[in-house]
C-alpha cells in the first residue's frame, strides 16, 4: 500500500464531437490495445445510429441508459472469524458509473449484431428501455445484495 495516500483522480477531458466527458469515458472503455481512433469511430458510429433510431440527442439517451444500468448496491467479501460473508454495501457514484460503462461495453461485445457499432447502439437502446443484458446484470447484483441483507451489519 502506498504511504503517501491515494493518488489524485485524473480529470478526463470531454470528447471533441459532443463535448461530453461521458462519451469520452465510453470511448476509453471501448478502446483495446491503445487504438483510440478505432474506438472513437465505433462510439461515434453507435451514437449516430442511436440518434437515427430515436431522433433524440444521443448523449442524453446514453446518460439515460447509464442511469438505468447503474447499481445502487453491491456485495463485497468480508472475512469474519474464518468465515467469508458477502456484505451488501452502497455503491459510490464514481464506481456506479464505471460499472455501468463496463457492463454496457462487455454485454455489447457479447451481442450477435454484425459490427461493434451496431452492438453498442443496440445495447444503449435496450438499456434506455430497461431491457437487455446489462440491466439483467444490475438486477442480479441487487438480488445478491438483497439476499445477503442479513450480513449488512458487517459493513465497514
UniProtKB/Swiss-Prot annotation:
Keyword presence, tRNA-binding: yes
Gene expressing this chain: rpsG
Example of a GO biological process term: translation
Protein name stated in the entry: Small ribosomal subunit protein uS7
Classification via Pfam families: Ribosomal_S7 (PF00177)
UniProt similarity note: Belongs to the universal ribosomal protein uS7 family.
Disulfide bonds listed in the record: none
UniProt cross-references to InterPro entries, sorted A to Z: Ribosomal_uS7, Ribosomal_uS7_bac/org-type, Ribosomal_uS7_CS, Ribosomal_uS7_dom, Ribosomal_uS7_dom_sf
GO molecular function: rRNA binding; structural constituent of ribosome; tRNA binding
Keywords for the protein's UniProt record, in alphabetical order: Ribonucleoprotein, Ribosomal protein, RNA-binding, rRNA-binding, tRNA-binding
